[in-house]
Amino acid sequence: MEQFHGTTILSVRRGNVVALGGDGQVTLGNIVMKGTARKVRKVYSGKVLVGFAGGTADAFTLLERFESKLEKHQGHLMRASVELAKDWRTDRMLRRLEAMLLVADHETTLVITGNGDVLEPNDGIGAIGSGGTYAQSAAKALQENTELSPLEIVKKSLTIAGELCIYTNLSHTIETLD
C-alpha cells in the first residue's frame, strides 16, 4: 500500500505573536483523498500549536505522544520535544513512523523529526512538508519586506505554496497565539 504524504505546514513568529497553519490536502499516491483535513491543532489548553506532515496515522500517533509529553513536563515545550525525539529515535515501533511535527508556543518554535532532531529556526519561521520550502521562502520575504501580521504571512505563504506544490491545496487551517 502506498504511503499518505505531502502537505505544507508553516509557522511564523513576529514579536509575541505566532501563527501556525497548514493546507488540507491528503493524497494517496497520485490521488487526492481529502481536501479539507485539519493538520494543525491547539493542544495543552490552547497554549501550544502543533502541525504535522507525513503519514496520517503516523502523525496522529506522534501527536498523541507529544501531548502526553507536554502533560508530563507541565507544558515545557523544549523538554517535551526533546523527550519525544528521544523516544522516537530509540523505540522500535516509533522509529518506523514517517512524519514530522512543527510545534510552537509563546516563546519557541521547533521542528521535530524522526531522526531525533529538535531544530529551532533562527528567524522564527519554520516549515515542514512537501511545500514547506516554498512557504518558508515566501514567509521570509514577506516578514522582511512588509508589516503583515504572522497570520497574514502564513495565509499568503500557504497560498503561494499551494500554487506551486502539487501536494498542497488552497484550503487552510491557521491557528494563532498572541
UniProtKB/Swiss-Prot annotation:
The keyword Transferase does not apply. It catalyses: ATP-dependent cleavage of peptide bonds with broad specificity. It is found in: Cytoplasm. GO terms for molecular function: metal ion binding; threonine-type endopeptidase activity. GO terms for biological process: proteolysis involved in protein catabolic process. InterPro entries: ATP-dep_Prtase_HsIV_su (IPR022281), Ntn_hydrolases_N (IPR029055), Proteasome_sua/b (IPR001353), Proteasome_suB-type (IPR023333). It holds the Pfam family Proteasome. The active site is at T7. Belongs to the peptidase T1B family. HslV subfamily. Protease subunit of a proteasome-like degradation complex believed to be a general protein degrading machinery. This is ATP-dependent protease subunit HslV. It comes from Herminiimonas arsenicoxydans.
